[in-house]
């Protein structure tokens, strides 16, 4: 299970600026419900919300606090498309079916927007996202994708910016050009997650914190999920723990399909008027390298800058300085700026970077492998699973058809493979 010492949120800029929110109770006694969801991040909550809104009984068990993992620590980018790119989807299912997947990715972003509006979630939601190209070959790849997206996916909202046009919006000389997406955007991930949790609870879902799953066993009516001092009997089981997928033997098979990649984020001091000159249209930015930088401004004018793979570096101060050096490559004018917050976390990726969710058994569902696109895709994953539980698996089935190669499961070799893979792609990015 999650390290038992991790009962509370780990320090981060997001935790320090979290909206007032309740502490949900620890599960006591034995309860019975239609669906039990293990995991109180966005995967689980975005499954619980539509179930509860449709009058379905649902319990969510969170081992630590709501949004404790990636949902409350990420860069906050809400992005259409998939991390694998539409080329991988096309290769697997063909262009016509890939167009359906494309529409799902667009709907994922709009689902975030509509839920923020419907439930009045205060999470600094801001439209605008740019993919930037560091090297000439990256710019060529970006232009090719832009043309393909226009021709086959009707992506007329995309704008292609050359170096001069990009410079009008971004105070950096590092990039060759960019593709701007006015529909994608960024938000405060912890506050968004807390808002979805409140919406689910208001709709009737029962949420429990500090209630780690310790054991699962079949019972007459479905499944019995144990926590340290209690249990939940349920018909349907949803395993929504992402990077913690291998924590229970029954779900060890999921560990073969996704691996946790570490990432690190720093937050500067408030930049005041300098922030407006840094990113003039307040968009989120990510480059299109394999080992990439991602950054954006916070609502109070800080630069939040993330990247790196800290798999073999356990010193937070060292990681802070490494990411700061990457920030200064993009914005050397920030050399005098203090770093006030730094934190790390894990992102689960599949081998081909396509999302991985579906069923392990008729009443056992899972979601993982968003590969950096989880702020948006969790909404569609949760909706697809909820719809399937309620009898309509039309949205879930196509995602189940996506093929995923196995990843080695031995812990040290997973870490080593992740590290060596990162180094290989860093080399590839620079050549």
Question: Could you say what each language-model-derived stretch is?
Answer:
Residues 31-60:
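N-terminal Rossmann-like FAD-binding beta1-loop-alpha1 element of flavoenzymes
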Residues 110, 119-126, 213-215, 230-273, ...:
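Active-site substrate-recognition segment that forms the wall
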Residues 140, 147-148, 173-235:
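Helical element adjacent to the flavin cofactor pocket in flavoenzyme catalytic cores
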Residues 74-103:
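Glycine-rich active-site loop/strand segments that organize a redox cofactor
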Residues 313-316, 320-430:
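C-terminal catalytic lobe of FAD-dependent flavoproteins
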